[in-house]
């Protein structure tokens, strides 16, 4: 029984990281209707920013975190302006190819600057481990869960209650109509990318704290799985991203513990296929009908 509970806790830890990354994915898609497949690599950039700020520049961890989040937000703005804005009216395939290109560009730039060897991630803060019987709960697991839940609520309130949030919803519904109403579509989408990329910076902190080492390809697989989590929960749904991330992490850890680590990824993606066959919009996604 302790083994099962410990596995579920490990799944919550992994899933909360996926959920945090998926929140950025689903926010950008929900507002801009674009899939930023370079999102995972922005996490890698954020992690390297912390490493550089702490070990090279000698800055305190808290300052390094702020720099990392700000850098990720700025990088998101630059990527949107240079790579995605010119393709706003292009076919989805063109946007997809561009996103993959941006992803490889970031990975190779990191490879040139930091080399292929993994770098140790600094300890940001020492969190105590909670022991309950034969089960232990790592402090970083609790912190990630709490922060992810708080961010999910904050984003939901921001989108539904603030002026910019209402502008985002209007742009999501109809860009042309929003522009006619005086809403700056470019500014709204830029802010969306900035917030989504800042969330990637937050995810970088918790990913680095949990796995302690970073390499140029660090963000690739977590990015893909977080995208899977967003689709699983319902792409465009903020609560869906949270639910999808948690469930995906739990399924992956259960697969590794009770089936095989070799089959874990296949099982995760297999479950996604089954969910999409049964409910194409994801667990919390809403079916939208359009008049032609």
Show which residues each predicted segment covers.
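Membrane-embedded helix boundary and interhelical linker motif in transport proteins
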Residues: 9, 31-78, 82, 234
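Transmembrane helix-bundle core of multi-pass membrane transporters
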Residues: 86-161, 188, 212, 254, ...
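Short, non-helical or kinked segments that cap or interrupt transmembrane helices
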Residues: 16, 25-47, 61, 89-94, ...
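Membrane-interfacial amphipathic/re-entrant helices at transmembrane-helix boundaries
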Residues: 1-21, 49, 60-64, 90-95, ...
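Helix-loop-helix "hairpin" substructures at the membrane interface of multi-pass membrane proteins
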Residues: 14, 136-214, 238-244
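Alpha-helical transmembrane segments within multi-pass membrane transporters and channels
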Residues: 25, 58-102, 109, 243-244, ...
């Amino acid at each position: 029984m302790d083994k099962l509970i410990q596995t579920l806790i490990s799944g919550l830890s992994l899933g909360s990281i996926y959920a945090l990354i998926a929140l950025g994915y689903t926010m950008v898609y929900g507002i801009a209707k674009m899939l930023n497949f370079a999102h995972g690599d922005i996490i890698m950039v954020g992690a390297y920013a912390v490493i550089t700020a702490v070990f090279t520049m000698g800055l305190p961890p808290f300052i390094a975190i702020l720099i990392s989040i700000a850098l990720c937000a700025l990088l998101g703005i630059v990527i949107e302006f240079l790579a995605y804005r010119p393709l706003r009216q292009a076919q989805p395939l063109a946007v997809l190819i561009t996103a993959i290109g941006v992803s490889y560009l970031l990975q190779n730039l990191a490879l040139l600057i930091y080399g292929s060897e993994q770098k140790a991630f600094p300890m940001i803060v020492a969190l105590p481990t909670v022991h309950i019987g034969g089960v232990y709960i790592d402090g970083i697991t609790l912190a990630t869960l709490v922060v992810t839940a708080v961010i999910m609520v904050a984003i939901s309130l921001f989108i539904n209650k603030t002026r910019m949030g209402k502008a985002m919803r209007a742009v999501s519904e109809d860009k042309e109509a929003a522009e006619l109403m005086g809403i700056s579509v470019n500014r709204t989408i830029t802010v969306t990318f900035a917030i989504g990329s800042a969330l990637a910076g937050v995810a970088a902190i918790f990913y680095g704290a949990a796995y302690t080492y970073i390499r140029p390809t660090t963000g690739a697989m977590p990015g893909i799985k977080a995208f899977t989590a967003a689709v699983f929960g319902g792409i465009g749904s903020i609560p869906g991203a949270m639910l999808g991330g948690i469930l995906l992490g739990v399924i992956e850890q259960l697969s590794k513990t009770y089936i095989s680590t070799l089959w874990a990824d296949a099982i995760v993606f297999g479950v996604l296929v089954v969910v999409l066959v049964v409910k194409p919009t994801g667990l919390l996604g809403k079916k939208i009908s359009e008049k032609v």
